[in-house]
Amino acid sequence: MLGVLLRQPLRALLDELNAGMVAAGYADLRPAHSAVFMNLDTEGTRITDLADRAQMTKQSMGALVSYLEQLGYVSSAPHPHDGRAKVVRLTKKGKATEAPARQNISRVQERWSQLLDKDEMEEFLRLLRKLNDVLQDDR
C-alpha cells in the first residue's frame, strides 16, 4: 500500500522537476540522473558509494556517470588512495544545475501547498521530516 500511495506523488515530483530543468535549459538531463546528483558529496564520491546510496548496480551507476561526464556535468578521477576506484565530482556546469533545481523544488512545494490546506501541508512536511530523520539514523 505504501508503494502505491507514494508512486503518484513521486512521479508528479519527478515530472515537474524534469520539466523545470528542461525549461531552465537542461533538456539533456533526465530523472534517472538524479541518482548521481542527489548522492554526490561536495568533495566527490566514489562510483561504488554512489551506487550503494542509490541502491543500484555499480555498472548502472557507471553508465549514468559516464553519460553525465560526456555532457560535462561531472568529472571523474582516480581515487587518491585506491587506484582502482574513481571519484566523481560536479563540474562548473554541474554546479550550475543546483540553483534551478532548488527553484524547481520550491515551485513544486508551492504548487502542492495549493492542493492541500495549510495545516495539511505543515503536517505532511512534518511527517516527511520525521521519517527522513528516522531513516537517516537507520543508515
PLM ranges: what are they?
Residues 119-139:
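C-terminal regulatory/oligomerization modules of transcriptional regulators
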Residues 51:
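The alpha-helix within a helix-turn-helix
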Residues 16, 35-38, 96:
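Pre-recognition alpha-helix immediately N-terminal to the DNA-recognition helix
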Residues 47-48, 59, 66, 86:
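Residues within helix-turn-helix
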Residues 1-28:
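N-terminal leader segment of winged-helix/HTH proteins
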Residues 66-126:
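Charged, amphipathic alpha-helical coiled-coil/dimerization segments
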Residues 42-46:
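Short capping segments at the starts of secondary-structure elements
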